[in-house]
């Protein structure tokens, strides 16, 4: 499932007032005023028991959501379903540096060190059993 499909699924099934961000490189993907959510979307081709989040994305979500008085959410799709993570202080994320591609689906395949953490599926809410 591509991020555009994930957005449409969420809009159709969960958040009818979901609005996409306007910029390609915004620090978020969408918002819902009805549910007071500031959301980053991620589509994964492979299912894992933990889902990666970059520290820089996490920090941007926390700061920008707080400035807008919205709750920061990180929503992931995998081949086995959709998981939503409300990024609250009680979710402890161990951070580590990993050598990863600069981007996921673009022509630039070079790698850099990135600070990342892994969210256990149990810390999120499963929105659908399979998509």
List each model region and its residues:
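Beta-rich nucleic-acid/ligand-interaction surfaces
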Residues: 25-29
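Histidine- and/or cysteine-centered catalytic micro-motif in compact active-site loops
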Residues: 23-24, 42-44, 77
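Nucleic-acid nuclease catalytic cores
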Residues: 65-91
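Active-site-adjacent loop/helix micro-motif of nuclease/hydrolase catalytic cores
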Residues: 45-58
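Acidic-basic catalytic patches of nuclease active cores, encompassing PD-(D/E)XK
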Residues: 1-24, 67, 82
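Conserved catalytic cores of phosphodiester-cleaving nucleases, focusing on short active-site segments
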Residues: 30-47
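Basic, amphipathic alpha-helical patches used to engage nucleic acids or provide basic targeting signals
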Residues: 55-68
């Amino acid at each position: 499932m591509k991020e555009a499909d994930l957005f449409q699924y969420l809009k159709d099934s969960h958040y009818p007032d979901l609005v996409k961000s306007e910029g390609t490189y915004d620090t978020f993907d969408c918002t819902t005023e009805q549910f007071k959510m500031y959301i980053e979307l991620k589509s994964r081709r492979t299912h894992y028991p933990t889902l990666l989040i970059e520290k820089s994305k996490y920090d941007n979500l926390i700061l920008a959501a707080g400035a807008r008085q919205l709750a920061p959410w990180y929503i992931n799709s995998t081949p086995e379903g959709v998981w939503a993570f409300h990024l609250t202080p009680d979710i402890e994320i161990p951070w580590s540096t990993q050598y990863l591609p600069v981007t996921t689906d673009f022509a630039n395949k070079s790698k850099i060190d990135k600070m990342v953490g892994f969210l256990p599926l149990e810390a999120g809410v499963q929105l659908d059993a399979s998509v």
